[in-house]
Amino acid sequence: MNLLNLPKIELHCHLDGSLRVETAIELAKKEGVKLDSYEYDKVKELLVIPKECNSLEDYLNRFALPVKLLQRAENLERVAFELMEDASKENVKYIEIRFAPLLHLEKGMTQKEVIESVIKGIRKAEELYDIKGNLILSCLRHHSIDSVYEVIEEGKNFIGKGVVAIDLAGGELENFVKPYEEVMKLARKAGFRVTIHAGETGYGKNVRDAIELLGAERIGHGLFIFNDEEAYNLVKEKGVTLEMCPKSNIDTKGVNKYEEHPIYKYHKDNIKVNLSTDNRTVSNINLTEEFENVHKTFNIDFEDYKKIYLNSVEASFCSEELKEKLKLSIII
């Protein structure tokens, strides 16, 4: 299989974890952000996960510089455009980009301006490249629940205009779900689709709770459903798609190597999986490389690939009309 040329769907990709190193250097100089060095390799070290990373918390530290650099509308628009451009070059036909709007208000932008600027970058790329994109608004679990209400209140104005879903992200504690039950009910009522980061760091039960209490239609990672039989069966029975990012899970020590990752086992047991990068820069990976690693490890064939692709289309939060177009890309 020529994996580069095959069509792809990416459903789990963080904007602030996917900046080009060159762009980070330019923006740091423009914004007067002082760095020890502006040399490519030195800046890359600030953005890409170090080999000695031992946890999700260590991994999340790589976001400090990108967040500093993305406090102006033109910067957000640029990095959204560039992410779409990069994805299009490896034949990604559709991507859902996620980011947390409340992290980008430090220099006076409103949430409305933040969201608009990212959508503008996505739409500009759509005009130039054979790719479509939508936005998922992430809320961070270490922020207050009131902050989720803020995101819903502003974000609902963009549903159907570039925003499709809401997400809970950040460090994952056991039993984090329950306090979000009411606010996620409100989000669903407002028209948001729901995907939740859960089961990334050892707690399969969080996946079960995210589906049952928050109405999650997709799960970010879901790596550890194998340690909770009820969660495993629920995901399988309800056809909930797991947005799986093996390289990221290796980086955060969820697993130690590709051979230990359950993505292929889940796929073969008819659990719906999507393969994504999570953070292209932080994990130093693109989607073609991720597929190559999975192909090399598990010897997936074209039928496996096609099944994952078509499932990813169905699991996406885009329009039915676009889904039908995307399905045609894989008919060979």
Curated annotation (Swiss-Prot):
Q: Name one GO molecular function term.
A: adenosine deaminase activity
Q: What is the protein's name according to its record?
A: Adenosine deaminase
Taxonomy, top ranks, is: Bacteria, Bacillati, Bacillota, Clostridia, Eubacteriales
The record's listing under Pfam families reads:
A_deaminase
Which residues act catalytically here?
200
Q: Name one GO biological process term.
A: nucleotide metabolic process
Q: Which InterPro entries match?
A: A_deaminase (IPR028893), A_deaminase_dom (IPR001365), Ado/ade_deaminase (IPR006330), Metal_Hydrolase (IPR032466)
Cofactor-binding details, from the entry: Binds 1 zinc ion per subunit.
* Gene behind the chain: add
For this protein, the record's CDD domains field holds: ADA
- Residues with site note (Important for catalytic activity): 221
